[in-house]
């Protein structure tokens, strides 16, 4: 992993880019966690991110900033409660002040099965191989 990428990961934020039907690349800022080399984040199950991923799983994660290090990969929607709760707990470690405000809304969506996890498996060679951050 390059020093630039390592610094960017510690910001725990990314610009997630996925493709519209037209092929246009859409970037959206989201938080991130890294789990065994895969980039993960939470979103609502009816978000446009989810709809675009289901149509075309190819994605690019710009780590740390809109023009940060690009990590291309394949995204998938994960609905497993344990994985979602792991990322929820990681968010408390990385963004505690914001989570104090939005935690109830996220927890409610998890309880009502309206929250999903997006997992991006980076292309090989994986620059985040075997990395987990933050550890929960």
Give, region by region, the residue ranges found by the protein language model.
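Extreme N-terminal tail/first-helix region
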Residues: 1-15
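Short helix-to-loop capping/linker segments positioned immediately adjacent to catalytic or ligand/cofactor-binding
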Residues: 3, 16-23, 102-108
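Glutamate identity and glutamate-enriched acidic tracts
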Residues: 4-6, 24, 40, 76, ...
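Covalent nucleotidyltransferase core used to form phosphodiester bonds in nucleic acids
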Residues: 4-5, 39-43, 47-51
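Short beta-strand segments
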Residues: 11-45, 59-62, 70-72
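Short, structured beta-strand-loop surface elements
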Residues: 46-126, 131
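Ribonuclease/tRNase effector modules and their secretory precursors
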Residues: 134-135
């Amino acid at each position: 992993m390059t020093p630039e990428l390592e610094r960017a990961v510690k910001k725990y934020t990314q610009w997630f880019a996925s493709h519209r039907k037209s092929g246009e690349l859409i970037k959206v800022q989201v938080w991130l966690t890294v789990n065994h080399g895969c980039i993960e984040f939470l979103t609502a199950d009816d978000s446009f991110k989810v709809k675009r991923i289901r149509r075309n799983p190819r994605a690019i994660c710009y780590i740390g900033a809109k023009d940060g290090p690009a990590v291309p990969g394949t995204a998938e929607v994960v609905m497993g409660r344990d994985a979602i709760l792991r990322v929820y707990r990681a968010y408390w470690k990385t963004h505690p002040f914001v989570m104090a405000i939005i935690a109830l809304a996220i927890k409610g969506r998890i309880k009502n099965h309206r929250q999903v996890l997006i997992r991006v498996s980076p292309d090989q060679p994986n620059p985040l191989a075997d990395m987990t951050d933050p550890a929960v």
